[in-house]
């Protein structure tokens, strides 16, 4: 894919990442933490535009959204920047390395999500003195519906795009 097309797609994915939380009801605690509306477009970006651009999208989207509407709050946005950048980077790299094998979409998705959660936990330990229990409860327990949604939705969308030959 030409760089111009990749950059255009990256800008579109960034816009989707920033705007998609508006689609959900405005209860950010319930829907923001549980369904993780900014996470899914970043994961999709890893497959569509590649690891480096997906990492940039993940790193800047929470800050753009914070500056635009004040949500997520800065205390949440900073760890999210690291988490989403890791999502994009690791998912894209693992997919590229293993794309010649079967199940590479699911494998790269799991690797990216796990790496992103680990980075998110480390940043929250440093910034907010989170304990292991807090990381497990907030990072995996509260986010479980979003994780399930991403595990279903991301492969479905990517397989669909591959089928209509929009991505490799």
Residue spans for each PLM region:
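Loop-helix junctions at membrane interfaces
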Residues: 1-168
